[in-house]
Design a protein with these regions (language model features):
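Central cavity-lining transmembrane alpha-helices of secondary-active solute carriers
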Residues: 38-54, 268-281
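C-terminal ends and interior cores of transmembrane alpha-helices
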Residues: 70-89, 300-314
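C-terminal transmembrane helical hairpin of 12-TM major facilitator-type secondary transporters
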Residues: 291-338
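Extracytoplasmic gate region of multi-pass secondary transporters
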Residues: 11-16, 224-275, 335, 369-370
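Cytoplasmic membrane-interface "Motif A"-like loop-to-helix N-cap segments
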Residues: 57-69, 286-299
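Symmetry-related core transmembrane helices of the 12-TM Major Facilitator Superfamily/SLC fold
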Residues: 168-187, 392-411
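Glycine-rich segments within core transmembrane alpha-helices of 12-TM secondary carriers
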Residues: 128-154, 359-370
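Cytoplasmic helix-loop-helix junction between adjacent transmembrane helices
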Residues: 99-137
C-alpha cells in the first residue's frame, strides 16, 4: 500500500507545472491532469469495485487480492509508458488514463483485501489501532511522494522545457516501489494462509449455508441507514482532502507565495501527521469509544482548514502551515473512527462487499471533484501560470464539500446517540 499511495500522489506537488503546458514536452494542461487523475476512479465507479467486492467474499482475500495487485502494477507500468512514449499529448493522455483506470481498480481492491484481513486478524481486539497503523504506513508513501517528486523534477528557469524523461522520473521510482510491494504481497499471502490454518478458517466465505454470500445481502446493505451515512461521510470527507492533495502546489504556491519545495513540505504535513496520530487515535477509539464524536470533530477540523486556505490573508505562509495542521488532525481522526465502525454494523460474510461499496461511492466523489478542480484551474489560468483566483475558487468548492461532510458527521452522531444499539460509540470489547 506504501507503493500504491506513492504512485497515486507522485504528481501532487508538481501540479503547478500543468498550469503552463507550453513548458512541458508532455503537453498536458491542468484540465488534462485532472482528467488523468480522475481515471483512477472510473472502473471503480462503473461497477468494478462492487463486483470485485463480491468476488472477494466468494474467492477470498488471497486469490482476489493477488489478481488485483498484479492489475495495479500493470496499470502503473502503462502510465509510465505513456509519459515517455513521445505520443501526441491527447494520445498520451488517453493511454495514461487507461493505465490509471487499471491502477486505480487494482489499488482499491488491494486496499479492500488488506482492510478485510485486518478485520479478521484483529476481530477480538485493537482493530482501530491496527487499521490506523496500516493507514499510517500507507500514507508514508504519500508523504514520500510529496517530498521527493519536486527533487526528482527540479524547477527550471522561465522559458525552459521539461523533457519527457524528466517528467516521468517519479513514475519510474513508483514502478520500483511497486516491484518491492509485490514481493511483500507474496509474503502477506503466506502469512494470511498460515493464520487461517491455525484458526481453522477458510479464505472464502463458504461454510455454513446461512453464512453464504447472496446478492440479496447487497440490497440489505443499501437499506442500512447506518451504512449509508458512513459511506456518504466517506465520499465527502475524503474528497475534501484527497482531491485537494492532487492540486496542492497549484493552490498553496499562489495563495501563500511560497516556493515549490516549501509547498511540498507544507502539504506533506498531512501524511506525516497521520503516521503519528492515526494509530494513536485508533488506540483512543479502541479504549474509550465515542467514534461518531471523533468523526464530527475531524470533519469540523477539515472545514476550518479549508476556510483558512480559501480566505486567510494571501502571502502569509503561517496560515498555510496552520491549515495543514488542522487538516492533518482531521485526516487522522475520521478514518481512525470510521473504518472500524463498518465491521460493527455489517455481517462478516458481506464485509468485503461493504468495504467495496464504500470505496465505490468514495471514488465516485473523487472522480468528480478531481475533474472539477482541474477544470476550475484551467478556466481561471488560461495558460498564464499559477493563479491565486483559481486557487481561491477551488478552495471555495472544497469548503462546500466540507460543509456537507460536517452535516453528515453530525447526523451520524445524533443518530448514534438516539439509537445506542448501533454500538458505534462503544469502546473495543477487549
Amino acid at each position: 500500500m506504501f507503493a500504491s499511495y506513492y504512485f497515486d500522489d507522485m504528481f501532487s506537488t508538481l501540479s503547478h507545472l500543468f498550469e503552463n503546458p507550453s513548458a512541458l514536452q508532455l503537453g498536458w494542461n491542468s484540465a488534462d491532469y485532472g482528467l488523468y487523475t480522475s481515471g483512477y476512479s472510473v472502473l471503480c465507479v462503473f461497477g468494478g469495485l462492487v463486483v470485485c467486492g463480491m468476488l472477494l467474499d466468494k474467492w477470498g482475500v488471497r486469490i482476489t487480492g493477488s489478481i488485483f495487485v498484479a492489475m495495479m502494477a500493470g496499470g502503473a507500468a502503462l502510465v509510465t509508458y505513456s509519459l515517455v512514449s513521445g505520443l501526441p499529448p491527447k494520445t498520451s493522455l488517453s493511454v495514461a488514463y487507461i493505465g490509471c483506470m487499471f491502477f486505480g481498480l487494482g489499488s482499491e481492491i488491494a486496499g479492500v483485501a488488506v482492510t478485510r484481513s485486518i478485520a479478521k486478524w484483529f476481530k477480538d481486539g485493537n482493530m482501530a489501532f491496527a487499521m490506523g497503523l496500516q493507514l499510517a504506513i500507507a500514507r508514508l508513501g504519500t508523504a514520500f511522494a510529496l517530498v521527493i517528486s519536486p527533487k526528482l523534477v527540479a524547477a527550471k528557469a522561465v522559458g525552459q522545457t521539461y523533457s519527457l524523461m524528466e517528467t516521468a522520473r517519479p513514475a519510474f521510482l513508483g514502478l520500483a516501489l511497486m516491484a518491492a510491494g509485490m514481493v511483500l504481497w507474496a509474503a502477506f499471502v503466506a502469512m494470511d494462509a498460515k493464520f487461517d490454518r491455525r484458526a481453522g478458517l477458510k479464505d472464502s466465505v463458504d461454510t455454513a449455508e446461512e453464512d453464504k454470500f447472496r446478492f440479496s445481502d447487497v440490497l440489505k446493505l443499501l437499506k442500512n441507514k447506518r451504512f449509508i451515512a458512513i459511506a456518504l461521510l466517506c465520499v465527502f470527507f475524503y474528497s475534501s482532502i484527497i482531491s485537494f492533495k492532487k492540486f496542492a502546489s497549484a493552490i498553496l504556491i499562489p495563495r501563500f507565495d511560497v516556493p515549490v519545495e516549501a509547498a511540498s513540505w507544507m502539504v506533506s504535513m498531512l501524511p506525516f501527521a497521520t503516521v503519528v496520530f492515526a494509530p494513536l487515535f485508533g488506540i483512543v477509539v479502541d479504549k474509550i469509544g465515542h467514534g461518531t464524536r471523533w468523526m464530527l470533530i475531524g470533519a469540523a477540523l477539515a472545514l476550518t482548514a479549508h476556510l483558512m486556505l480559501a480566505f486567510a490573508p494571501s502571502g502569509v505562509p503561517f496560515y498555510g502551515y496552520l491549515a495543514m495542521v488542522f487538516l492533518g488532525f482531521g485526516y487522522s481522526l475520521v478514518p481512525a473512527a470510521m473504518w472500524p465502525s463498518v465491521p460493527k454494523i455489517v455481517p462478516d460474510k458481506v464485509l468485503g462487499t461493504a468495504f467495496s461499496l464504500i470505496y465505490w461511492v468514495q471514488n465516485l466523489g473523487l472522480m468528480s471533484f478531481k475533474m472539477l478542480a482541474g477544470k476550475i484551474l484551467a478556466d481561471s489560468n488560461l495558460d498564464k501560470g499559477v493563479s491565486e483566483s483559481g486557487a481561491v475558487r477551488v478552495e471555495v468548492m472544497f469548503v462546500s464539500v466540507c460543509v456537507v461532510a460536517l452535516v453528515l458527521a453530525y447526523a451520524l452522531n445524533l443518530y448514534s446517540r438516539r439509537n445506542p444499539q448501533m454500538r458505534l460509540d462503544l469502546p473495543d470489547k477487549s
